[in-house]
Amino acid sequence: MLIKVRVTTDARAEKVVKKSDDLYVVSVKEKAERNMANRRVIEIIKEKNPGKRVKLIKGHHSPAKIVEVG
């Protein structure tokens, strides 16, 4: 399953908001440097989907990402 993720970096608090079945808005405390924010986004999505494989498909350098969960 492919989901769209809109990421806000350097946030005060981490949170996940599900806008629709395939659109999430994720705020992370990490800065968008050295892939730290991307790694944290993947960790958060894994926590929400235990036992599933999570892979970043598109948007490595963009706040709009496409992630494969499955």
State where each predicted segment sits.
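Contiguous, often N-terminal, cationic amphipathic patches that form binding interfaces
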Residues: 1-43, 47, 51, 56-70
